[in-house]
Amino acid sequence: MQIQKSFKGQSPYGKLYLVATPIGNLDDMTFRAIQTLKEVDWIAAEDTRNTGLLLKHFDISTKQISFHEHNAKEKIPDLIGFLKAGQSIAQVSDAGLPSISDPGHDLVKAAIEEEIAVVTVPGASAGISALIASGLAPQPHIFYGFLPRKSGQQKQFFDSKKDYPETQIFYESPHRVADTLENMLEDYGDRSVVLVRELTKIYEEYQRGKISELLESIAETPLKGECLLIVEGASQNVEEKDEEDLFSEIQVRIQQGMKKNQAIKEVAKHYQWNKSQLYAAYHDWEEND
């Protein structure tokens, strides 16, 4: 059991501040963040060049220490040493909150183990900022950060998450979004998704629609800039039906004058099946019937 009194405690140690930085718009930097960065003894920065530009903009002269995922293991003992000597440290990532898809978690754990106060200086967070403007249910939600890059691993990931009812938040590179949506469509079915691009910047854009609609849009206009995907959770109200029942519903629509492809598309959408998989299954059923 441990109780931390962030500001009223009597610890001789310095404090570890986790300071949020802008995710694209410098006007989102808070007064408290600027003041904290000016007052601490050290700034542990993911990229000292990027952070250097931020510090210059706000006239901050505090010394920096490089701290990122590739040197964290060797740097953490040094940083803990500074903190135990009574010096304060602000940890920043290139954008947003430290530890959220960025280095910092291991440093936080090490500080807590040494009973060093860890203090959040809140601010911009891309995932939550995109979620609240997405139009999808803001809670419950699950933030996953960056997806596996390899297609096979990504498909396994989506297969394990397809039945989750929570809204899901992902970061993705613009040149991988199309492949990611294809993999998602295969496992999730054609559910609602929001693609958020260049959040807080001049070219900020939201594309809202079904996964298949976004794929068509991306094919026509390739993406640029940093991207997030906000995906609708699995519906808990959709009646489960086996293939035979779905085939019957498709036939009813066809008999009512609907074209086969449109009938399959509507049934797949209603029951949250993957359209391509249902089409292939229906085609095989037709041939063998």
Residues of each region from the PLM?
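Loop/turn-to-beta-strand initiation segments
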Residues: 15-16, 86-90, 166-167
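Short active-site oxyanion
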Residues: 37-43, 115-119, 167-168
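Conserved helicase motor
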Residues: 67-73, 147-150
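Glycine-rich, flexible N-terminal cofactor/catalytic loop recognition
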Residues: 1-67
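Class I SAM-dependent methyltransferase SAM-binding "motif I" and its flanking Rossmann-like core
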Residues: 107-161
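Glycine/small-residue-rich loop that forms an oxyanion/phosphate-binding "nest" at active or ligand-binding sites
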Residues: 79-125
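A contiguous loop/helix-start segment that scaffolds small-molecule binding in enzyme catalytic cores
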Residues: 2-5, 13, 167, 174-289
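Short glycine-rich anion-binding loops that position phosphate/pyrophosphate groups of nucleotides
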Residues: 23-25, 94-98, 174-176, 234-236
